[in-house]
Structure formats: structure tokens, C-alpha cells
A protein has these predicted regions:
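Short, low-complexity, charge-dense intrinsically disordered segments
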Residues: 1-4
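Intrinsic-disorder/low-complexity coil detector
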Residues: 8-10, 67
Length: 140
């Protein structure tokens, strides 16, 4: 694997007697490999809640992370869930887009129900509550 083609680095970490497999994303979204993948999102900021540190940011969509996929910021990969209009605790769906931040180390995945699609404009309208603070590009 090289940095230009991207890929996933698989690691095994040992926690006590337990072995945990962790995938670390390395420039993978640059080549669009994740778009179309089915993922499970654990929702830690349900629709209708506020950001834990920035109380003026209201979550108009469900937002969470994909377990065991580590993003470049060292945290699990963040994801917006579109098309679900009620708060949920977790969600299994398809990655339909990647939001690339030019002024941050993070990329956000956009996940939706199988067979549902959104235009770049529709995605930005739904995630602008948070993405308005960054220089971003949506990749479909």
C-alpha cells in the first residue's frame, strides 16, 4: 500500500486478554473506495440534540461514528446519517458521499438508506449546520 493509492491499515491491538482488530483509514476516500460501502454508524449525537462543546450547534440530522475505522484525527470515523427523520441510536446504511475538509484533518462520511441518493446541494443543505465552518468539498 502506498500513500497515493490509499488503503486500509489493519492492526491488532491487545487489551488485556482481548485482541481487537482496528482498521485505520489512510487516504482511502481519495480514491472513492468507501463510497458504496455498507457501514454501521453508532449515533452519539442524535437528531434534535446540541453539540457537547459548542452549544450553538444543533444537530438537524443524526451524527455518529463507524466503530473500528480510525480517521486521520485519531478518532473513529465520523458520519452524518441522511434520510432518517427521527433520533436513532445506531444505523446501518450505505456511504453515499464523502465530505472532504480542506482546512481540517477530518473527512466526514455521509450515510443513507440503501437505494436513497442526494445531490451535493441537498447534502450540503442538511450538513451546513456544522460544515459551514469549514472549507469543504462533497465527493459522490
Amino acid at each position: 500500500m502506498d500513500a497515493e493509492s490509499g488503503g486500509v491499515l489493519y492492526l491488532q491491538s491487545f487489551f488485556g486478554s482481548e485482541v481487537m482488530d482496528i482498521r485505520i483509514l489512510i487516504n482511502l476516500t481519495e480514491v472513492g473506495v468507501m463510497i458504496g460501502s455498507i457501514v454501521r454508524v453508532v449515533v452519539d449525537r442524535p437528531l434534535g440534540t446540541f453539540h457537547p462543546k459548542h452549544k450553538d450547534i444543533y444537530y438537524s440530522v443524526n451524527y455518529g461514528y463507524v466503530s473500528n475505522v480510525m480517521a486521520p484525527d485519531g478518532e473513529e470515523q465520523d458520519a452524518y446519517i441522511l434520510g432518517i427523520n427521527k433520533p436513532v441510536e445506531e444505523f446501518v446504511g450505505r456511504v453515499i458521499a464523502i465530505i472532504h475538509r480542506f482546512d481540517d484533518v477530518e473527512e466526514k462520511w455521509v450515510v443513507a438508506t440503501e437505494g436513497v441518493s442526494f445531490t451535493k446541494e441537498e447534502i450540503m443543505k442538511q450538513v451546513a449546520f456544522q460544515e459551514q465552518y469549514f472549507h469543504t468539498e462533497i465527493r459522490l
